[in-house]
Amino acid sequence: MTLVKICGIKRIEDILYVNKYLPHYIGFVFAQSKRRVSADQARSLKQKLAPGIKTVGVFVNEAVEKIVEIVDECKLDCIQIHGDETVQYVDTLRGMLHSHPSGRGVEIWKAVRVKDESYISLLSLYKADVFLLDAFVEGAYGGAGKVFDWKLASLAEAFGKVFVAGGLSLGNAAEVVKSIRPYGVDVSSGVETGGFKDEFKIRQFIDEIIQADKEMC
């Protein structure tokens, strides 16, 4: 079963959509972005989230202490670090989470912006629960809706669980599942219309992933 994460949740309407179609994860972006939410907003939205949907906090080069503070305030299930975080940074973050009551059991996801095969070797250095592969775009920490070579994700699976992000949409959701069978897929702009989450696209995206999984059985 391919897991699905809908990232960039910021409105009560978005929560209503995901409660209806039940992705496995949703993402709250705390980094600078047009989808950015405050800790107060995320906490309020999470209170309305259906049981069983896990929350991922997305951070870029944030102070470790601030991340732990937001984890405590919002009761996040996972932390996705999407910047230039070092191996030492990740180890420090894990240690601080484990020493804090609200942080125990919180997963750490390390995002890597993939340019070529040489970037995959970086994964061996990190102790992460999940690796999220995104497209490399100069000057941007997100993939900006760009697709990378999915074959690289197959190589990354040697180092752990892999989520594929970057340019996923209704047009290619099933293709990525059938071609490399990743642990999970992450979508944001691919299920939006006019900069806002689109109920039809969310439903269709999840349906396409489910159908692709069935065809691969």
Regions found by a protein language model. Give the residues of each.
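Conserved N-terminal beta1-alpha1 strand-loop-helix module at the mouth
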Residues: 1-98, 104-217
